[in-house]
Amino acid sequence: MIQMQTYLTIADNTGGKVAQCIKVLGGSKRRYAKIGDIITIVVKQAIPNSSVKKGDVCKAVIVRTSKEVRRKNGTYVRFDDNACVILDANLSPRGKRVFGPVARELRDANFMKVVSLASEVI
């Protein structure tokens, strides 16, 4: 579960390393976001000469959470970190690569491009 002020790792090659959630999109009083939800982030750490800079505000989709997610068959899946992938205005990924595993729930949330770029889908 991601809420405002949560720090996340950026799991793509846009150049950002660490981001902070500043808004959970989808309702005025919505507090938490889970895998497949869109949030607004601010980049806190970035590598030099990259497409995103420190202080950039952009939208992102959550691909991994430390909080477990229950699936229909009764199994639970959780990850070691909270991670997101930066999106452009058309809600497609800005980077060309996605690092680390991503959850299968992204397929249900219609982020097929992120799923196809990922090296592993769990």
UniProtKB/Swiss-Prot annotation:
Domain of life where this protein originates: Bacteria
InterPro entries recorded: Ribosomal_uL14 (IPR000218), Ribosomal_uL14_bac-type (IPR005745), Ribosomal_uL14_CS (IPR019972), Ribosomal_uL14_sf (IPR036853)
Name of the protein in question: Large ribosomal subunit protein uL14
One Gene Ontology biological process: translation
Species per Swiss-Prot/TrEMBL record: Borreliella afzelii (strain PKo) (Borrelia afzelii)
HAMAP family: Ribosomal_uL14 (MF_01367)
SUPFAM superfamilies linked to this entry: Ribosomal protein L14
Disulfide bond residue pairs: none
Family: Belongs to the universal ribosomal protein uL14 family.
Keyword field contains rRNA-binding: yes
GO cellular component: cytosolic large ribosomal subunit
Record text on subunit structure and interactions: Part of the 50S ribosomal subunit. Forms a cluster with proteins L3 and L19. In the 70S ribosome, L14 and L19 interact and together make contacts with the 16S rRNA in bridges B5 and B8.
One matching Pfam family: Ribosomal_L14
